[in-house]
Amino acid sequence: MKNLLLLALITLPLVGFSQLWNQVSNFTGEGRHHPITFSNDNYGFVMSGSNLNDAHKYDKSNDTWTQLQNVPFSSRNYSYGVNIGDKAYMGFGYDLNGQFPTDWWQYDMNNDSWLQLANFPGSGRLHPAMIVVNNKIFVGCGNNSSGNLGDWWEYDVLTNVWTQKSNIIGNNRHHPYYFGIGNYAYVGFGH
């Protein structure tokens, strides 16, 4: 009895800190590997992946999925995207032709429109780090047919200009962890 009471005292406080999951509407598109995903306060977006070129929007207000116009770039895997406000920026990956594209795109979430931006001037890649800090997007690491990469780039969304920065300290890598806090980008680990 004492053991049971002790177990209850230990586990009861943890119940209040457990996560609660709710099922939402199932995704209406085809299942996929490594799509581009991003969101704003109202919608979540799933685009491309598994060499598909479709795009979908999830509306949390009515728990529905809507298929949008197809992405204007070649379908690809391992692409990445981030957003600043209601604009998403995306590129990179690996396409059906075995290429590592360097095209760079802006997607307007409010009116489902696309704008091709300045191409990435470095080597195409998959699994890069992509971090937003203020109005700049930092991209680096990743890998391609040459192996792991360690270069680091800054994209200014206000001027549509890419600038190469100092390479990452340490080993070249792909698929690292990454995040931005305040005015700093943090990157580490990876393969």
Describe these PLM feature segments.
Residues 1-20:
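Bacterial Sec-dependent N-terminal signal peptides
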Residues 18-191:
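Kelch-like beta-propeller repeat domains
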